[in-house]
């Protein structure tokens, strides 16, 4: 039986219009920073905590804009779908991969669409939405 995970993730966009993607240790797919809520957390509280744990970056609530809610297959777990709450923010730092992260990648969304190592939800929903709203990319 398919289970559903709820997650919150961040679309961090720099001034060059690139999105920051992360790859967790022991996995092959890049995705946005983020994760599952702890008990009682709202989606925005979850994304703020996860971004701090994974990248050491603190955002205020006012810095993060709700960017949509999508459902799709989980990248690293079989028979699992995810319900993802996304938040977008401008970010130009050079974070270090912390916690369970192995690798960080700043990439143009157009280039990310051509890669095989991008999480399904990102490739099918988030990147096309970003490209359809080019003002979000600073383009």
Question: Which stretches of residues belong to each language-model region?
Answer:
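Active-site-adjacent beta-strand/loop module that shapes the phosphate/pyrophosphate-binding cleft
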Residues: 5, 69-96, 109, 133
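Conserved N-terminal beta-strand and adjoining loop/helix that marks the start
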Residues: 1-19, 36
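The catalytic Nudix box helix
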Residues: 32-67
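A short, polar/proline- and glycine-enriched secondary-structure boundary/capping micro-motif
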Residues: 30-34, 107-109
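Short loop/turn segments immediately following the C-termini of beta-strands
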Residues: 24
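Conserved hydrophobic "DFG−1" position in protein kinase catalytic cores
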Residues: 12-13, 21, 89, 106
């Amino acid at each position: 039986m398919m289970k559903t995970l709820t997650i919150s993730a961040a679309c961090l966009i720099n001034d060059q219009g690139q999105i920051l993607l992360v790859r967790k240790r022991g996995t092959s797919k890049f995705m946005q920073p983020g994760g599952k809520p702890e008990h009682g957390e709202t989606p925005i509280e979850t994304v703020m905590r996860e971004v701090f744990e994974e990248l050491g970056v603190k955002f205020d609530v006012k810095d993060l804009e709700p960017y949509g809610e999508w459902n799709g297959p989980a990248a690293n777990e079989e028979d699992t779908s995810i319900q993802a709450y996304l938040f977008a923010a401008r970010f130009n730092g050079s974070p270090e991969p912390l916690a369970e992260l192995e690798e960080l990648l700043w990439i143009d969304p157009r280039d990310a669409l051509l890669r095989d190592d991008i999480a399904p939800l990102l490739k099918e929903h988030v990147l096309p939405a970003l490209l359809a709203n080019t003002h979000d990319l600073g383009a």
